[in-house]
Structure formats: structure tokens, C-alpha cells
Amino acid sequence: MVLIDLINARGGHFSPNSWRVRMALAHKGLRCEVRDIGFMDVPTLHPQGEKVTIPTLVHGGRWVTDSWAIVRYLDEAFPDTPRLTGTGSETALLQFFQNWVQTTVHAGLARLIMQDLHRSLLSTDQAYFRESRERIYKATIEEIQAGREDRVAAFHKSLQPMRQSLQAQPFLGGAQPSYADYLAFGGFQWARISSPFAVLNQDDVVHAWFERCLDLYEGLGRRESASL
């Protein structure tokens, strides 16, 4: 089993969606080989030229792309391991939470770390990243991140749904971590690896939760060094 993942200039694995899969694999006690690539390698990855995204899992000749599809596949392919995505309404709720993470956590973090993220990338990836993100945001990389010190409080406020849950329990999944935790963890790990900017206050319960997540599975998250 091979996980295809992005690396930055320091060799760090920074993709938030890949971290969802990494934590899911650890939760299930599954091991895999990691194939490191840059953004510019993605178009030529598949031997038949099929479109893939990162992360992609290759298992038994099958290529599974997209983090949600990968975790669903792991639940099906390894039924004797702890299930992560549930069934029926549980799955629908997880998909709702994934959408919230994408539109609130990831979107908010992107505007706090964008220039730092660009600087951290492989030199061969920087031009592509700049052009694609500036086209999406209709602003320069520098403009996207500018004024973050004045905007970070609004980001903190947007995390109130997480904060309220974590005031009553150590993980979003309750006493033990669940895939909901890994969905949210990926974004904060993305920021930790890509930028020295403090996106959370140390006295925030969300910060304490993130530290607990970093310690899971023998410190899997901490093995990737933080940005300096």
C-alpha cells in the first residue's frame, strides 16, 4: 500500500487532506509506504494518464484519490479494523463536518499562512502555486496574507463550535479521537508545518486539543517538524 503525498522544501508533509489519511491509517493500525512528490509531479503520476489529486492511495493495483474516498475505501478493504466513516446518518454528519472544516478552518487558515506556505514549497512548485492561488483569490499571495495580525481574532471566533465541544470532552469524538478529529487536525497541522505564525492562542481549548492530537499514535504528528 502506497500513499502519494506532497513535500515542501524541507521534506515536510504539509497537505491537510493527506494528514486526514495519515491519522486514519494510524487509527486503524495500518502501515503504508509513502511516495514523496511535488505539485509539478501530479499531472504525470498515473501510468494511464488518469487525473489524480493528493492524497492518492495505491493498493492492490487500485488508485484511490481524494481523502474521503480513501478513508471510505479503507473501511471497506479492512473491515476488521476500527471503522471511521460510519453508515447512514453518521456518514452524512461527517460529510457535513468535513464541509465545515473546508469552508471555515481551511479557508480561514489559508488567509493567515498563504505567503509563508508559498515560501516553504519546493522551488519548482512556487510559480505554479502562486499563479493558481492568485487566480482563485483574485489577489497576490502577499495581499492574501497581509494584515493577518488584525484578522486572526476573527478566525478564533469562527472556531466556537469546536471550542464548545472541546470544553466538555478531550476530543471531538468524545473520550477518544474519531475521524472528525482527523478532519479538523489536518488543517492545523498544515499551518504548523508551513508557517511560524501562531494561529491559536495557547490558552485556547482548541490549542490543547491540537496538542493532544499531535501526541496520538506515538507522536505521529510531531514527527513532522514545525515551521521555523
Which residue ranges define each predicted feature?
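Structural alpha-beta junctions
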Residues: 29-31, 217-220
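Eukaryotic N-terminal low-complexity, Ser/Thr- and Lys/Arg-rich leader segments
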Residues: 227-228
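GST-like fold's C-terminal all-alpha helical module
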Residues: 101-211
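Intrinsically disordered or highly flexible coil/loop and linker segments, enriched in small
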Residues: 171, 219-223
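Short, flexible loop segments at boundaries between secondary-structure elements
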Residues: 209-219
